Amino acid sequence: MTYALLKKIDAPADLRKLDRRELRTLADELRAYVLESVSQTGGHLSSNLGTVELTIALHYVFHTPDDRVVWDVGHQSYPHKILTGRRERMNTLRQFGGISGFPRRSESQYDTFGTAHSSTSISAALGMALGARTLGEQRVSIAVIGDGAMTAGMAFEALNNAGVYKDLPLVVVLNDNDMSISPPVGALNKHLARLLSGQFYAATKKGIEKVLSVAPPVLEFAKRFEEHAKGMMVPATLFEEFGFNYIGPIDGHDLDSLVPTLQNIRKRALEGAGPQFLHVVTKKGQGYKLAEADPILYHGPGKFNPAEGIRPAAKPARKTYTQVFGEWLCDMAAADKRLIGITPAMREGSGMVEFEKRFPERYYDVGIAEQHAVTFAGGMACEGLKPIVAIYSTFLQRGYDQLIHDVALQNLPVVFALDRAGLVGADGATHAGAYDIAYLRCIPNMMVMTPSDENECRQLLTTAFHQNCPTAVRYPRGAGQGVATEAVLKDVPVGKGVMRRTGGARSGQRVAFLGFGSMVHPALGAAQALDASVADMRFVKPLDVELVKRLAEEHNYLVTVEEGSVMGGAGSAVLEALAEAGIDIPVLVLGLPDRFIDHGDPALLLSQCGLDAAGIERSVRERFGIGQAPVAVASRVA
């Protein structure tokens, strides 16, 4: 495709110069460009193919960037990026030094609010609308939110707050495409089904059908009206109760419907008609049959040939940590009927598909509702069950108060299986699990574990399951070390690390690495060159203080290494232990620096942070003057 029309669009102002009849052609070109781009770089696909017409209509009608558009989650923002001057940079999408896969304020004036976690858009758009009013500026703020994100309480908190302002130019666009990563769940999604399956409705319907059976054309009309009513009745009532003027549902792929509807909405909003709620229905994967047929497979693919589609991948030589967790979960559930599996809408990503199939009565997907997931697990634990909350490290941040107040304060035995701990690569800083060690180890009663390989992950999960306190096991995204897992469900001694290498003293300056989780193996690589000792600490809390003291006594220098924030992390725990013991020894703390790490290849990012074997070795030599002329060492003394 030549993209003749699309190449003329470098900003929404160019788009608004087009005749409305040209928008259909533009949509076809834009959809093809999204498919071509994502197939070459990897990224989110299904959601972006579904928002092409909506994106065009929004930028065609609203005066962006003066009018503010906030994209909830933001993984559906590729058409937006293409239309706002980043078309030629799509080949750098989610790559180191390239454009982000999510809206980013530093990237474009059209990215009015940075997003990546769900359900934040309405709050942000409301703040912008009231901010504009405070400044005496007239503009419209628009939140575009998916049906999956509408399961989160934060979205309803914002709706409840927004409805108070009866003349505020705020627009909420519900992109109803059934596209949370796992199917949306909960009462909101089932409310209409309950209403339409009730006894009164069934009896009324049966009676009407009996009366109208003598007039088939009228009966057919009634059936069509019923289908329309199913989409209209409950949403209108619900959102109007919040103080919004509800419009819809309308076809989110029909530009002839979208454009005039949005024009009317903008006009009414600026005339003081108050908050507007537009319900659009879109199809995930629209226009690419393979993605339409399997939108979950095409939710976030890697590179692929669009003509062939995603081919079955060869079985990897090494299991991922997510697979290790999924297998352990099924094995542990078979061994102990108290086990309950909980996920906040991340069944596939957290490795729970097989568990749901085998133990459906013990599987709970609570929707995109992390706060609820944590407290819900606490309630389960109160009844003597053993809940496992499978959650990404970055998403547990959303349930932090519940973690402290509802679980740890009551010392409830909930296991948090923290996937995506550390750097995650292409998704960047918004999805990095950089802070869990720091924010977990400060909580009383909490136990924190960091496995260094697949078998240790299985063992520490088993150990966590058998504790009578809240526990967290953090493990990284991607493949493990290739270590075979034992079939037996085996515990390890709580609070005890193990030595992986005992170094000599070739240099006369003995170094000991205290490795946590994924950093044990890079530390082993550095230790070979330095002839250093390496401890696999396994536990951040309770820390193996005796091992720390022994290593301090037997070595000249200690080096802690973790794939987490150095501020308040495992290295800080070691320094605290040394201070408590009154031990004075130079300590080098290595981990993720005090800044947000951008997107890119994980190995490259670790290298940039000095957390590969070469970087660790270099840091040790520079800090302690090993292998070079002696230098004064500004020791970090505990």
UniProtKB/Swiss-Prot annotation:
Protein name listed in UniProt: 1-deoxy-D-xylulose-5-phosphate synthase
Family per record: Belongs to the transketolase family. DXPS subfamily.
Role of this protein: Catalyzes the acyloin condensation reaction between C atoms 2 and 3 of pyruvate and glyceraldehyde 3-phosphate to yield 1-deoxy-D-xylulose-5-phosphate (DXP).
UniProt xrefs under PROSITE patterns: TRANSKETOLASE_1, TRANSKETOLASE_2
Cofactor note: Binds 1 Mg(2+) ion per subunit. Binds 1 thiamine pyrophosphate per subunit.
HAMAP family in the cross-refs: DXP_synth
Keywords: Isoprene biosynthesis, Magnesium, Metal-binding, Thiamine biosynthesis, Thiamine pyrophosphate, Transferase
Reactions catalysed: D-glyceraldehyde 3-phosphate + pyruvate + H(+) = 1-deoxy-D-xylulose 5-phosphate + CO2
Any one GO BP annotation for this protein: terpenoid biosynthetic process
EC number annotated for this UniProt entry: 2.2.1.7
The UniProt record lists the keyword Magnesium: yes
Species the sequence originates in: Cupriavidus pinatubonensis (strain JMP 134 / LMG 1197) (Cupriavidus necator (strain JMP 134))
Record-linked InterPro entries: Dxylulose-5-P_synthase, THDP-binding, Transketo_C/PFOR_II, Transketolase-like_Pyr-bd, Transketolase_BS, Transketolase_C, Transketolase_CS
Molecular function GO terms recorded: 1-deoxy-D-xylulose-5-phosphate synthase activity; magnesium ion binding; thiamine pyrophosphate binding
Subunit and interaction comment: Homodimer.
Binding-site residues, Mg(2+): D147, N177
GO cellular component, one term: cytosol
CC cofactor: Mg(2+); thiamine diphosphate
Biochemical pathway: Metabolic intermediate biosynthesis; 1-deoxy-D-xylulose 5-phosphate biosynthesis; 1-deoxy-D-xylulose 5-phosphate from D-glyceraldehyde 3-phosphate and pyruvate: step 1/1
